[in-house]
Amino acid sequence: MNKDVLQGQSIIRYEEGQLIQTTDSYVTEFPLTINVNGTEFATVICSPTHMEELVVGFLASEGAIYKKEEIKSLQIDDSKGFAHVELTKDLGDRFEYSTKRMIASCCGKSREFYFHNDAAIAKTSMSKITLTPKQVLNMMTGLQTASTLFKQTGGLHNAAISDGDEFFEHRQDIGRHNALDKLYGFCLERRIPVRNKVLIFSGRISSEILLKAAKIGVGVILSKSAPTTLAITLANDLNITAIGFIRDGSFNIYSHPERIKATE
């Protein structure tokens, strides 16, 4: 069950020299505490939709599971803000220090956890996908068209997964990492192969977002914004094509340009 993503409130708006009373929509920020095998694992600040996909994708991106079948049971109690997960295996000692973490909607995890765990889980892409410039531009246009809640609030991150021609699904969330985890969970639940897929993302490609793409296993990530220097380094090391500044019929290729073919 999903709670309301948007809420309305009466506000005062200044416009054209006047203060006007009106109603505005804003996004819901929902804390979801994930308990794994009876132990508190993390609290994720998220938009309260597709929460089962979020939990599955989050656990996979943390390396707690590798496939959906490793989850024996998963129950969402959205009235209290808990996800109760029972795995078919123990988590192991390497997760002991990472329990009870707060994953905020605005940022990623601490640098310590990023280097200790995230980089170890990231996979070097073996993707054979190739794309034309037209496909790149069309995918970003498609993401912007699908981002209905962002148009209403300006407060959500958007992500989609595609084979270059067709969108398989898109997700929106107050947290940029959550949008990708929801897509990851969607693919795991439906056993969708991701090696030759593309991630389309509304935000900046940071090192953490690039690592998230590597964990998911895609070979290409697209964004309307620019990547960071560490993200470019990681993209080159992990054989991922990172493309940014997709706007007005142009884009920049920052790593592994061999996947983009100029001929239409």
UniProtKB/Swiss-Prot annotation:
Keyword Nuclease: no
Subcellular location per the Swiss-Prot or TrEMBL entry: Cytoplasm
Active site: 107
Any one Gene Ontology BP term: Mo-molybdopterin cofactor biosynthetic process
Annotated GO CC locations: cytoplasm
Keywords: Cytoplasm, Molybdenum cofactor biosynthesis
InterPro entries referenced in this protein's UniProt entry, alphabetically: Cytidine_deaminase-like, FdhD
Molecular-function GO term, any one: sulfurtransferase activity
Function: Required for formate dehydrogenase (FDH) activity. Acts as a sulfur carrier protein that transfers sulfur from IscS to the molybdenum cofactor prior to its insertion into FDH.
Protein family according to the UniProt entry: Belongs to the FdhD family.
The name this protein goes by in its record: Sulfur carrier protein FdhD
Protein encoded by which gene: fdhD
